[in-house]
Amino acid sequence: MTNTCTPNHKSSYTYEDLLASGRGELFGPKGPQLPAPTMLMMDRVIEMNETGGQYGKGYVEAELDIKPDLFFFGCHFIGDPVMPGCLGLDAMWQLVGFYLGWIGGEGKGRALGVGEVKFTGQVLPTAKKVTYRIHLKRVINRKLIMGVADGEVEVDGRVIYTATDLKVGLFQDTSTF
């Protein structure tokens, strides 16, 4: 992997660390960035490793504290507030990209697809915590750096979304993407 920065190999990250990632400060100027609030879909990363998960190829676990005043509850839907499922899916893509930066990958992260997504529950404003779990299946390190993972979203201890083959790539140039 062409890497001009030292990977930031902590096993957990605070909200301030995640904000630093969004500013391009955590993994260096060429490392992938997380989005800034309000699109940052996690408050902390509580575990990261290169050998864990269902496939033994990497694991990420992160959390989002649910507060009734989160932006989406006021508009999705009026009188029937629920977190959009696409935001949970985006959080999983965010975490795959974060993992690629954590192992030293460089470039701008882009979601490239997902095999299958299932929604079997919802996040309501009465919930307390969302937990995301990412199980890396493989990392491709060629001209394009790409992570492939399975993921799940849990609310208050119950799995409500699952996704297979989440794909995120790191691109040196996104002008023709």
UniProtKB/Swiss-Prot annotation:
<dbReference type="GO" id="GO:0005737">
    <property type="term" value="C:cytoplasm"/>
</dbReference>
<keyword id="KW-0275">Fatty acid biosynthesis</keyword>
<comment type="function">
    <text>Necessary for the introduction of cis unsaturation into fatty acids. Catalyzes the dehydration of (3R)-3-hydroxydecanoyl-ACP to E-(2)-decenoyl-ACP and then its isomerization to Z-(3)-decenoyl-ACP. Can catalyze the dehydratase reaction for beta-hydroxyacyl-ACPs with saturated chain lengths up to 16:0, being most active on intermediate chain length.</text>
</comment>
<keyword id="KW-0443">Lipid metabolism</keyword>
<comment type="pathway">
    <text>Lipid metabolism; fatty acid biosynthesis.</text>
</comment>
<feature type="active site">
    <location>
        <position position="76"/>
    </location>
</feature>
<dbReference type="InterPro" id="IPR029069">
    <property type="entry name" value="HotDog_dom_sf"/>
</dbReference>
<dbReference type="GO" id="GO:0019171">
    <property type="term" value="F:(3R)-hydroxyacyl-[acyl-carrier-protein] dehydratase activity"/>
</dbReference>
<keyword id="KW-0963">Cytoplasm</keyword>
<dbReference type="InterPro" id="IPR013114">
    <property type="entry name" value="FabA_FabZ"/>
</dbReference>
<keyword id="KW-0456">Lyase</keyword>
<keyword id="KW-0444">Lipid biosynthesis</keyword>
<comment type="similarity">
    <text>Belongs to the thioester dehydratase family. FabA subfamily.</text>
</comment>
<dbReference type="Pfam" id="PF07977">
    <property type="entry name" value="FabA"/>
</dbReference>
<dbReference type="GO" id="GO:0006636">
    <property type="term" value="P:unsaturated fatty acid biosynthetic process"/>
</dbReference>
<keyword id="KW-0413">Isomerase</keyword>
<dbReference type="GO" id="GO:0034017">
    <property type="term" value="F:trans-2-decenoyl-acyl-carrier-protein isomerase activity"/>
</dbReference>
<keyword id="KW-0276">Fatty acid metabolism</keyword>
<comment type="subunit">
    <text>Homodimer.</text>
</comment>
<protein>
    <recommendedName>
        <fullName>3-hydroxydecanoyl-[acyl-carrier-protein] dehydratase</fullName>
        <ecNumber>4.2.1.59</ecNumber>
        <ecNumber>5.3.3.14</ecNumber>
    </recommendedName>
</protein>
<dbReference type="InterPro" id="IPR010083">
    <property type="entry name" value="FabA"/>
</dbReference>
